[in-house]
Amino acid sequence: MRIIIQAIKESKNFRTLRKWIKQIDEWKDPRTKGFSSDKKLHNDKYISVHGLTTNTEKRSICDLFRRSVDSCVLLYILATRTTIFGYKFKYNLSALISNKDAILIGGLILRHQQIIPNNVYSFTEEYGLDGRERGIVLMPFYSLFNHSCNPNVVRYSISKKVVMSAIHPIKKGEQLFDNYGQHYAIIEQSKRKENFLQQYYFLCKCTACRSDLPRYDGLYCFEETIQNNSVKLMIKTALKNLEKYASLAMMDKVKNKEFMIQELSKMIQILHDHVSTPSKEINEVVEILKRIYGLIGNKFVLPKI
């Protein structure tokens, strides 16, 4: 409903809204679909939302029928309880069917119901040792980032902004990969495949899936794979503060300790340079780094009574 209101508010009238939709639907290049006239994809513009994928052709009849019924109910409420179309409709469905503006909005509601499950992001805040979901948000710009079961970035929020930080070395020209809630270290590949097909309608072909990487408990420690004793010693020295940082992160004692981010990043770089990734250690360092990023961001705090 908020998306519909935003669309009408931005366009000022249904005629302009129709013009926008026609331009987006007829756009040939999928890479720039939804971009504004200044050649930018704005998070706060409706046309950016309208250009997002729906996967209509991949959805089941049952799925589309349910969303269609929901759209009809929402449209009926809008028409009979508000003056969004200029006046309140009487409780008469035939009047809706013959109104071209009502048909337009009903179609958009149906489209948005297909856009949302494929494109929204949940945002969480640290609460104790876990994260609490605070809501979901539709950010067209973030939909440009593809998924990997072994992502190289992490998302967290600071104030009213979403921040994306690297958690693995990223070379110039390499792609940034987010994670859609399906990490190879905790979810086996067959289950990830099932989840992706059910919600996103695609088969993941990331490096973790192509290599069929084992979960965390099946990974090797670096000492099991490295024969050179001097390299082993160097890695052990680099990781000497790992347990200490893990304890500080667990107890939420990372305030004014930004140096920990730098040291953990160095650990990750050394492991990448000398250990066949992934390893148990690199997963451990990355998880601690993610925890610290979460703690320096927004936190969910319940006041003590």
What is each stretch, according to the model?
Residues 294-305:
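C-terminal helix/juxtamembrane-tail motif
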Residues 2-30, 34, 147-291, 300:
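C-terminal SET catalytic tail plus cysteine-rich post-SET Zn-binding segment of SAM-dependent SET-domain
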Residues 4-158, 199:
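Catalytic cores of histone-lysine modification enzymes
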